[in-house]
């Protein structure tokens, strides 16, 4: 489990695709501390299992389902990615419950500065949007954020400068994809509600 509090920005060394799956290598520092082969690291919100460790990075296998559902397949050498280790049992719970199981992607529509915040507008599919609620939690590229507005074809979040500096979100431009994970509690509530109707 993760919390959506990014620990550092890593740099992609390579994304080697073979057919529909691949291997991702990332240069990192902080997330390597106490990390072992077999541990989980969220890369742009996607839970990946560390398959090998280097003094300054790690590699992980990326399944075909992950390539299809997330934006990891478009990573290139030099790309910056958000990194977070799985939460330790004695860790602080700073964001919200994040599984690292991406629901799909969205597209950056605009980034607008307003005083000490930046409004980020994201378009996404109806399947993801119907589980997004105003003032609820959403995980965007591994970042725990609060939904400020829900619109007909997307939603908006307001990002403080600190979050912008510590993550890759404000490096995005309109048209860039982002990984989205809906609040897991909302997903279970929606599932139970559908079953009760049947």
Feature map (PLM): residue ranges:
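Conserved loop->alpha-helix
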Residues: 1-198
